Amino acid sequence: MKKLILIITMVVSTLIMQGCEKGMDLQPQDYFDGQQLDIAKAIYDGDRPQLDKQLSSVNKEILNRPAKEEMTLLFWAINNAIYDKTTPERLKIITDLVKAGADPLQPQPNTPGSPAEFVMKADKGIWIQAMLEGGLSPNARDKVHNQPIIFESFDAANTETLKILIAYKADVNIKGAMNRTPLINALYNSCPEHIEVLLAHGANPLAKDDFNDSFLSLISAEIDKGDKSNA
């Protein structure tokens, strides 16, 4: 069963990244029971009034407790806000859950990172925007590597999630592992469009990492290599 869930999750992940319009109809009772099942059913039905009633009496422990196959209610809400279910009301359900205490940075074993990291890799910014509306900080860091979630945008097919974070006042010079900035990471990930967006919004090309390298010095070194190879 775990292998099946992993396969389904991988397919869902791929389709979210591609912005597809139709998905698998997973059922709430396949994963949840008790109070979590009531919440999951409201999410599945897209019933925000009913969800509000459930959330008014739920504690954060229940809201964030992994159910069968490590499924969480927030990831369940994401699954129910994709394909033809990508509606404003269903995106607001994601916002409602985060406002109520669902943790978008909670590591999710069956997906590439936490819900926030997962949706940062998508080719649309609507899911991360829903979390930001719920209170997620645009400068949030993952709980495993302490890496700013802005770096996850470099795995996306375009700059949509990056632009959303910036619109919500993300620090474009925030430093991650080895004190590398988003600009340096975008360079190492060969993301010219992301670099253009970062520079247009004030990213500092002179900021140095632990190796005393800056974006500008790395670019200059690459130009020098090219000049020498052409000599």
Task: Report the location of each language-model feature.
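Positively charged n-region of N-terminal signal peptides that target proteins for export
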Residues: 1-4
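Bacterial N-terminal signal peptides
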Residues: 7-15
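C-terminal motif of bacterial Sec signal peptides marking the signal peptidase cleavage site
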Residues: 18-19
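TPR-adjacent "capping" and linker segments in tetratricopeptide-repeat scaffold/adaptor proteins
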Residues: 24-32
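Ankyrin-repeat boundary/"N-cap" motif
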Residues: 31-39, 64-81, 107-118, 141-150, ...
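Ankyrin repeat A-helix N-terminal signature
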Residues: 41-46, 76-89, 118-124, 152-158, ...
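Conserved ankyrin/ankyrin-like repeat signature
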Residues: 50, 89, 93, 126-127, ...
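Ankyrin repeat domain, specifically the short helix-to-loop turn at the C-terminus of the second helix
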Residues: 55-62, 93-103, 129-137, 163-171, ...
